[in-house]
Amino acid sequence: MRSASEDRTAIARIRDAAIEQWGRHGFNVGLRSVAEAAGVSAALVIHHFGSKEGLRKACDDHIAELVRESKTESMRSADPANWLAQVAEIEDYAPMMAYLVRSMQSGTDLAKSFWQRMIDNAEQYIEEGVEAGILKPSRDPKARARYLSMINGGGFLLYLQMHENPTDLRAVLRDYGEDMMLPALEMFTNGLMTDSTMYDAFLAQREQGIPFSHPSEGEGNDGSNSTVPAAD
């Protein structure tokens, strides 16, 4: 009979193998391949996770929690040494980032639920930063968290596609940290615009309940006046 500690070890091995295999090869990789990579039987995978979807959800939960813990730690610390240490270890996140990229690309309901959880977590740890005095408060914390999550996820995906060696996630992450960290920090710290004129104008329109995108006078909603050429 397997002990509880052995079961926990097997669960972690299976989960980590799944993250690595699916991150490297995509979600078409079956449970037998995951089991082989973990050094266990396919039956044991089913025993612990029930199905491929159950295993994927366990991987999602694990990664979401790892990201939340790491970001929360950063937000609670005002010591630059801690921030620099986290960036120095960025290559260690390669299996996790490969999995996140596959999840973004899959577009499934499970992936959407996973990313919504990541966004919800982002709202929480950003507020930790506000409470710690590291970040400025927002008039709409939920919208800010959603925006930052999307530009970070989409931005990394674009960086990956443009990298000279996109299959080497360790190299991609190393270069991403070197290329993106300072420009991002400069913009987040110093801002981009010289004053709030544009923000004030859009905010005033939002507060009047007027959508930013709406048909001009005389235009319908059928797109008949669109400047985008119709497909033949």
Task: Please describe what each predicted stretch is.
Residues R13, A17, Q21-G54, A58, ...:
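Helix-turn-helix
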Residues D120, Q124, E128-E131, L157-D232:
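C-terminal peripheral helix-coil segments that are non-catalytic and often amphipathic
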Residues V87-E123, L160-E164:
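Amphipathic alpha-helical segments used for helix-helix packing
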Residues A58, E65-R102, S106, P141, ...:
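Hydrophobic alpha-helical connector segments
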Residues R13, P95, Y99, R117, ...:
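Amphipathic alpha-helical interaction segments
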Residues S149, G154-L158:
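Outer-membrane beta-barrel translocator/channel fold
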Residues R2-R13:
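Short, Lys/Arg-enriched anionic-surface-contact patches
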Residues V67-K71, T108-I134, A143-R146:
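Amphipathic alpha-helical packing segments from all-alpha helical-bundle domains
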